[in-house]
Amino acid sequence: SAHGRTGSRAGYYHFDFQTKEAIAFIESVIKEPVHLIGWSDGGIISLLIALARPDLVRSIISIGTNFHWDVGLPFDEEPTIELTEEDRAKFAQRSPDPAHMQEEIIRKAYAIWRKEPNMTKADLATITCPVLVLCGDDEPFSNHHTIDLFESLPNAQLAIVPGTSHAVVKERPETVQSIIKKFNDDLKTNDAFPITKMPRLRKEKQELLLAPQDEVE
């Protein structure tokens, strides 16, 4: 989301545009199903890829992600944009866009965040790959929204890291790395489906997985 080295094009920053770009990259460069890790907008795009092309997604780690725009995010109609000299220098070094585009891109982002994404719980229920929902306990959106995301996904795990915000990756890097490593290790067994002692959401599927094969058949 505007952090790369590609210049701005028509339709840029809309989630549909970014999803199509990501799908094209997977198809043309990686050429096989992938494990996706997305932070913030990247998490949204990862979920949208799984909705559009489930055949391309093996698993998702979704960090600090909202699935709908209407969750009380603090985006003013006309945001105050304050760019430091360091911000401007990094943009000039990285982006082929002219300098004035930096502020325009930020304003475009705010405008889109006020209207997108528009996923529903019913949409999320169709994503069958393993998903790790990871976030801080003080995100810009409510923890209830994060729990709705988690409980709407049929094969998901939830990690809320205490004492962190939307910058959880930077605030508790060792904790985040440990959680991600455990999830990735578990992908080797039952597609990261955890077998627990007292399941509620996972009870039906766990019973099916643990049933003798002749009973399943």
Q: Which residue ranges define each predicted feature?
A:
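Active-site loop/oxyanion-hole signature of alpha/beta-hydrolase fold enzymes
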Residues: 1-37
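Catalytic nucleophile serine of serine hydrolases
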Residues: 6, 40, 64
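Flexible "cap/lid" loop of the alpha/beta hydrolase fold
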Residues: 44-52, 56-90, 199-201
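Active-site nucleophile elbow and catalytic-triad environment of alpha/beta-hydrolase enzymes
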Residues: 107-123, 137
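Short beta-strand/loop motif that positions the catalytic acidic residue
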Residues: 126-127, 133-135
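Conserved alpha/beta-hydrolase "acid-adjacent" motif
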Residues: 140-145
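Catalytic histidine neighborhood in serine/cysteine hydrolases
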Residues: 146, 150-167
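Catalytic active-site module of serine/aspartate enzymes centered on a nucleophile-bearing elbow/loop
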Residues: 162-217
